[in-house]
Amino acid sequence: AQGYRDANILADTIINNQKGNLDIHIKLEEGHKYYFGNISWKGNTKYSDSVLNMLLAIKKGDPYNLETLNKRVGKELSMEGGDIGSLYQDDGYLFFQADPVEISVYNDTIDYEIRLREGPQATYDRITVSGNNKTKDYVILRELRTIPGNKYRRDDIIRTQRELSQLGFLDPEKIVPQIVPNADAGTVDINWQVEEKSADQLELSAGFGGGIGLTGTLGVTFNNFSIKNIGKKATWDPLPSGDGQKVSARIQSNGKAFRSYNFSFTEPWLGGKKRNSFTIGYSNTK
């Protein structure tokens, strides 16, 4: 990271000291400190040298750091973005490749030529989901931004992961896009591997006060409800589920002085084609 390209470990020794700890002695050879020289581009037709240089953000005279160079050109897919690979992949270039090549080393300076293979723009082909046992496929598929026929974009993958995790009934850490590119056809298949989690919520509190009697609150919320499966007892676990609907019921009592009942049902995709939330509720206070 500090420009010591030829740094090398010559020897290492581990010694048990008198205190029962381990002392580690490492003998290093730093070598010369190197700096970036001229950086040129080859194979870029979509973006100009000036645009790529701006994103690369490495100037002549900066300390040599191969890890930084590989990260800036996007040798591997980055979730954070801001690198050259992300620039291409957000415009459909799934098959983009970048290969930084040393073309000259003189004194303490290294010149690079960054060779790009842009490839064709890819489109989504087969999009599937797996791992969902209760949740219907369509409930997950309607949330996806990776729509068959559309141009591939890295940002679609990232936003879909984030939005699926916000549903509440999928484990955010187990949402994995399994990407299968087909370079010959210029397409990409994606299987969204998911794992469900319990999303139901229970609220319970109770107390007793002199003069007012028993007080308390009981509330339940089901976040992956299915109203159309109410009549199908075989689907109850413990209630009908799988359509991504939300049902909430809450009872609150303050002894004889106050009682309230609240019930609500929410359909997040009324009509099924656009995200259009519909909620109906009932409330009664005595």
Kindly label every feature range from the protein language model.
Residues 1-167, 171-172, 179-190, 194, ...:
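Interaction-mediating elements
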Residues 10, 46-51, 153-286:
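Gram-negative/organellar outer-membrane beta-barrel architecture
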